Amino acid sequence: MVAKNIKYNEEARKKIQKGVKTLAEAVKVTLGPKGRHVVIDKSFGSPQVTKDGVTVAKEVELADKHENMGAQMVKEVASKTADKAGDGTTTATVLAEAIYTEGLRNVTAGANPMDLKRGIDKAVKVVVDQVKKISKPVQHHKEIAQVATISANNDAEIGNLIAEAMEKVGKNGSITVEEAKGFETVLDVVEGMNFNRGYLSSYFATNPETQECVLEDALVLIYDKKISGIKDFLPVLQQVAESGRPLLIIAEDIEGEALATLVVNRIRGGFRVCAVKAPGFGDRRKAMLEDIAILTGGQLISEELGMKLENANLAMLGKAKKVIVSKEDTTIVEGMGEKEALEARCESIKKQIEDSSSDYDKEKLQERLAKLSGGVAVIRVGAATEIEMKEKKDRVDDAQHATIAAVEEGILPGGGTALIRCIPTLEAFLPMLTNEDEQIGARIVLKALSAPLKQIAANAGKEGAIIFQQVMSRSANEGYDALRDAYTDMLEAGILDPAKVTRSALESAASVAGLLLTTEALIAEIPEEKPAAAPAMPGAGMDY
């Protein structure tokens, strides 16, 4: 077993403090509209330029193992806030440092760390309840654009694109961010259900120019096994041909005689048909086929349910107003399924998202929900250079998450103002704490609430304490607009923060800072000293 180096008491706390401070100093320079960029060296390719707190935090690794423990714990604050709310990672880091620094001062002065933590937790609950009270729901397209603009470092173009995307796909819709090939940042919206499986033969294409197969008022056959022979398949094909409507076939695969028959039918000018492979794999494929069946009002023909392809009839087929199939993907527009069944399916998927512990599963479930309920919007980020594109993509990601958080839990006056407005409520709560050290813990949170505002002011070249006093003396929604160096009504000026982001930042910061305050010993491996390399043998160069 490797020997360990153990630090205790004051020495341990100083090491943690140094690690916390080192990480926080790198992260907090990015806060606010006048926050700076951080350039991160990469082992390959060009350096990364970012203003995203969690991206900076993830890159910090300190040489001293004990200091690194403190840094890694605060890194956890940024990561947890990003996981919960998708934004607010810099605010969370600033709050964590403020709570820990002030808490450490009191522990050194003799306060009981466990009582301090209890006081911190109680104070945070009071502030979170107040944040929920003062938040207001997002009601207009304009407010979504304002939240996105603030989160994208005051880039109105990004804000408007995200608001437009949210409006088009709805709150259950999916917004994905990709890199564009050109300089422009554009929005593409795919209406209806889209999945990345194209036609199995180019002979199915109805438009030679676009190489797409477009089926109007189509029937949809959904089967969960391979179709290779024509015998089992023929009865339903004859019924469809008699109906005179085009047919989309979705199956695990269509090959051999079955595919050849369909292709020959198209070449000879028979009824319009197109065959595609089913999307997804394994259990996820079955779930997606069931989604398509509900969307189109058809049935999934599955042998597991005792159904056979040879017994399929028109009543089992789904219906859609339009189907567009390209070489790469398929889009079903206006499926004619029952509204109640569709809503029930969406609710079932939402429940699965809540119950799932895997980020990957959640993402896939969210995609399914979006395809069923709203549609998919793709924001393609363009820029002059790759470095600029990556930095812009980070900001679009932040803005997207901020808008989703705003829709979920409402909005607050931004620029650190909302936390300042919680100070009077917390002051009124202090006398209710009878334990002196718990009261000190609550006061630590009270002092920390002004830290984000002070940091925004400092990054704008102003004295944080003076700005704080000015904001405290003003009415509810008035705060400091660092971009214009003015005091204004933050809601009217469109300087908004999502309530979920503010809440998550405070909860994550207090949780980790409280744990650090109650730490009394640090254990780390002693780094092995590698022996110096042996000197080269004389004359080894053979130059004599």
UniProtKB/Swiss-Prot annotation:
SUPFAM superfamilies: GroEL apical domain-like (SSF52029), GroEL equatorial domain-like (SSF48592), GroEL-intermediate domain like (SSF54849)
Assigned EC number: 5.6.1.7
Highest taxon, organism lineage: Bacteria
GO BP, sorted A to Z: protein refolding
Residues reported in the UniProt entry to bind ATP: 30-33, 51, 87-91, 415, 481-483, 497
Reaction catalysed by this enzyme: ATP + H2O + a folded polypeptide = ADP + phosphate + an unfolded polypeptide
Main location, first listed in the record: cytoplasm
Stated family: Belongs to the chaperonin (HSP60) family.
Subunit record text: Forms a cylinder of 14 subunits composed of two heptameric rings stacked back-to-back. Interacts with the co-chaperonin GroES.
Designated name of the protein: Chaperonin GroEL
Organism for this UniProt entry: Chlamydia trachomatis serovar L2 (strain ATCC VR-902B / DSM 19102 / 434/Bu)
Gene transcribed to yield this protein: groEL
